[in-house]
Amino acid sequence: MPTFYLALHGGQTYHLIVDTDSVGNPSLSVIPSNPYQEQLSDTPLIPLTIFVGENTGVPPPPPPPPQRRDAWTQEPSPLDWDPLGYDVGHGPLASAMRMLWMANYIVRQSRGDRGLILPQGPQTAPQAMLVQPHVPPLRPTAPTILSPLSQPRLTPPQPLMMPPRPTPPTPLPPATLTVPPRPTRPTTLPPTPLLTVLQRPTELQPTPSPPRMHLPVLHVPDQSMHPLTHQSTPNDPDSPEPRSPTVFYNIPPMPLPPSQLPPPAAPAQPPPGVINDQQLHHLPSGPPWWPPICDPPQPSKTQGQSRGQSRGRGRGRGRGRGKSRDKQRKPGGPWRPEPNTSSPSMPELSPVLGLHQGQGAGDSPTPGPSNAAPVCRNSHTATPNVSPIHEPESHNSPEAPILFPDDWYPPSIDPADLDESWDYIFETTESPSSDEDYVEGPSKRPRPSIQ
């Protein structure tokens, strides 16, 4: 008998259509009467099982009641006749107990507990640890660490009341050396070493303790070995003495080694930063997109005279250098090239070195804005005869200087500003030539004048 399983909303009306497909098998169609409310309904889905067949025979058993999917998160109902559910491990009660166990486990983990929950049978250990801290503040309790954990703890408090009698045990120092061994545990013996301990500080403590105090300072790595030797060999003869100093000596050297480790680690091989610094010293100053800078030659006497006139006017940026070169030839005579005629294809410029740039000879009688020579004359190169733009031409139609092509500028600089000259910024005197130059061409930036 074909069986169909459906999940329908409660309180809804559906059209149930049973048909036979082309193969002959029954087909079931369930269409909601209100398709829009089918999507917006908040009622829970009800599982249905539909058997398609004849009415003869025994009806099928009813399906078991559906179990809520959130049963594990619900409290077990007191009215539930089967609290453990159909399966022992999946019922509401079993799931609630499992959640409780897991919550307890998480809390124990957060508190630092590890492992399973076991009855803490050996609770005497924490009590013994509690008794020890109360005893150590007094010096006579040091030998109690060597003795077993049960009996001697009760006896040390008794000799603590005995210290006012240091005189009688004077003949017993040799006997006390044999008393501390473990085989002898009577209550009468512990007081005798405790009484002798009060006398020994005046006799024996000053001699062994000073070297032990100096050892950790002088030999920090070896000090860890010295306490071990004092604890192993003199346990029998001087049990109370080496115990107390060794405990104090083991503590200070521990922070010392870490403090001494960083200094040797610091002087390591020179880091790569040193190499980068050396490289930075050789790099030219200025923006990275400028051409390489050449060292200026030693200025001659004639250059020094002209440099005194043009000082402060060669600091302008390279955008207007070409125009200034054109204007520098107006007031003076014809240009006389340098003796060396071999010139590179693209002259090297120095935007930073402005004070060392001279005019070669006293060609500029009038100090004006045209006294800046941007070319770096490392090899006395004659750049004016390279390009035709250096030929004498009228200042009415200035052209873009070929010394600074558009390709050399970063994208942030507008090539339209190449025609401007910045040499007038450093002017301090008036010259008829400078006024004529800037009156004709409009400038975007104000020109400081003394008018």
Curated annotation (Swiss-Prot):
Query: Per UniProt, which keywords does this protein have?
Result: Activator, Host nucleus, Host-virus interaction, Inhibition of host innate immune response by virus, Inhibition of host interferon signaling pathway by virus, Interferon antiviral system evasion, Modulation of host cell cycle by virus, Modulation of host PP1 activity by virus, Phosphoprotein, Repeat, Transcription, Transcription regulation, Viral immunoevasion
Q: Where are the sequence repeats?
A: 311-312, 313-314, 315-316, 317-318, 319-320, 321-322, 323-324
UniProt keyword Repeat, yes or no = yes
Recorded superkingdom: Viruses
Q: Where is the composition biased (Pro residues)?
A: 154-193, 252-273, 285-299
GO MF entry, a single one = protein serine/threonine phosphatase inhibitor activity
Locate the region 6.5 X 2 AA tandem repeats of R-G.
311-324
Instruction: Specify residue ranges for compositional bias: Basic residues.
Output: 310-330
Composition bias, Low complexity: 300-309
Per the Swiss-Prot or TrEMBL annotation, the motif PXLXP motif, interaction with host ZMYND11 is positioned at: 347-351, 401-405
Chain segments annotated as coiled-coil in the UniProt record? none
Q: Give the residue ranges for region: Disordered.
A: 52-78, 148-451
How this chain assembles, per its entry, is: Interacts with human SMARCB1/INI1, presumably generating an open chromatin conformation at the EBNA2-responsive target genes. Interacts with human WAPL. Interacts with host CBF1; this interaction allows transcriptional activation by EBNA2. Interacts with host general transcription factors GTF2B, ERCC2 and ERCC3. Interacts (via PXLXP motif) with host ZMYND11/BS69 (via MYND-type zinc finger). Interacts with host EBF1.
Q: What does this gene product do?
A: Plays a key role in the activation of the host resting B-cell and stimulation of B-cell proliferation. Acts by up-regulating the expression of viral EBNA1-6, LMP1, LMP2A and LMP2B genes, as well as several host genes including CD21, CD23 and MYC. Activates transcription by acting as an adapter molecule that binds to cellular sequence-specific DNA-binding proteins such as host CBF1, SMARCB1 and SPI1.
Q: What protein name applies here?
A: Epstein-Barr nuclear antigen 2
Species classification: Viruses, Duplodnaviria, Heunggongvirae, Peploviricota, Herviviricetes
